[in-house]
Amino acid sequence: EIMPSLVGSEMCIRDRTNALELRRQLENEGAIFHGSSDTEVICYLVTRNRLRMGSIETAISKTMDVLEGAYSLVIMSATKLIAVRDPRGYRPLCIGTLPGGGYVFASESCALDAAGATLLRDVEPGEIVVADAKTGELRSIRDHVGRPDSQMCVFEYIYFSRPDSIIEGQSVHEARKQAGRFLAQEHPVEADVVIGVPDSGLDAALGYSEESGIPYGIGFIKNKYIGRTFIQGSQKQRENSVRIKLNAVTSTVKGKRVVLVDDSIVRGTTRLPL
């Protein structure tokens, strides 16, 4: 569903939690939901806990006690902007500073660039960061920080994130290039050209080319009006979308030995048409 979700005076953005169990519990207590988003469940939990405890920071920390799974949240009240990252740190969340003062939160640093902000640091796994409009201060609440099994989802570097983002000090572009270099070391072949599958496979292909010495070429043109195919409803829809999503540059690949680099295989729908 479209974000953000609003319940009372608290607004939450983005989540992935054990929502179904919590939703049923809240419904049994009289909550009425207006959509199917997990975010609405978190909004209700925070609002309920705040009514009981008074402090929104305490309410959020109490809510985190019962949440399971991956989530990165930005919660806005009348005077505070609050960033929350799940204790395992599955999803990224970062803090930026604005030129005229103030703070901004985003799941990727490239969003900070677009807002004219400067990357300050990442929100740590389990951390609650509060930007207070009254004091102008940034406060850290660390009740859930320090979990030993903290680990970011590897797909953030491989696929989800934009290559111009920096996550936990690591350039996504350079991480993908390095993956391509490792691939060239582990699977060297004789070929005439290295090409990547747009868009997230391009950086890895460039790394493969640099490591192997095989020239890099543009092998596909991507139809920018076709979104991610692996999330579409049926196999037929996915196959049709793949056919019109990518078109080969024949001058690059015709009659040549080609190394084709992609970032990953989820369903494998793209593989056969390519």
Predicted segments with their positions:
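Single conserved hydrophobic/aromatic residue that forms the stacking wall/gate
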Residues: 1-8, 13
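PRPP-associated nucleotide enzymes
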Residues: 9, 16-274
